[in-house]
Amino acid sequence: MTRYKAIISYDGSQFQGFQRQSHARSVQEEIEKTLTKLTNGKEIKVHGAGRTDSGVHAYGQVLHFDLDQDRDLEKLRFALDTQSPEDIDFISVEKVSDDFHSRYTKHLKTYEFIVDIGRPKNPMMRHYATHFPYPLDLDNIQLAIKDLIGTHDFTGFTASGATIENKVRTIIDASVRYEEDKNFLIFTFTGNGFLYKQVRNMVGTLLKIGNNRMPVDQIKTILEKKDRQLAGPTPAGNGLYLKEIIYEDK
């Protein structure tokens, strides 16, 4: 068996998420169906690095799968790219060692979250940016976002009822920039892992801080108290993008 690693991008607006589901369209299912076509009916299991939610997009999702024969890499990439639905693109395919696992091999993830702050909003971006048409103090957001950097227990930023026990994660970079030509705020977070809805809840909190409905030091309070009720609302997933996954060299 040969293990392959692929980097893909997808428009998440017509998917219920990456992970296969019984009664909804998923990225995993579409790719597995394509692999079945390319291997004369064999069932091939795909493993993704990140389980993006409904409506969430990806520039650089990573997955791996095993095939029982050696394939020319560009021919395989081209076949996967052209046989998959139009909202999935295969950027690259490479051979990896048998102990590589897209999810469990140590890595860093980078997410972007795009907020359309235009009044009126851009209707062409309704599936690709979350709209927030209220006044914002960007300086306050830039001050507050720095408090997320470091190793913290992010219980206060995960979804209520999350069952995972260890909620300690490390964020090595967190920033926000304003794109004046589009009237977008773009939040960027890089870390060793993120809890369920963590990125969206961090953005929702930062928007409240920027709108002066929370104090600038609210991030510190949430991290200290570990209380989801102290954080902001969860924005829609349409503004969230899995941008890049970088694996640690052995």
Curated annotation (Swiss-Prot):
It is an enzyme of class 5 (isomerase). Keywords: Isomerase, tRNA processing. The active site is at D53. Substrate binds at Y111. Pfam families: PseudoU_synth_1 (PF01416). It catalyses: uridine(38/39/40) in tRNA = pseudouridine(38/39/40) in tRNA. Belongs to the tRNA pseudouridine synthase TruA family. Homodimer. Formation of pseudouridine at positions 38, 39 and 40 in the anticodon stem and loop of transfer RNAs. This is tRNA pseudouridine synthase A. The lineage of its organism: Bacteria, Bacillati, Bacillota, Bacilli, Lactobacillales.
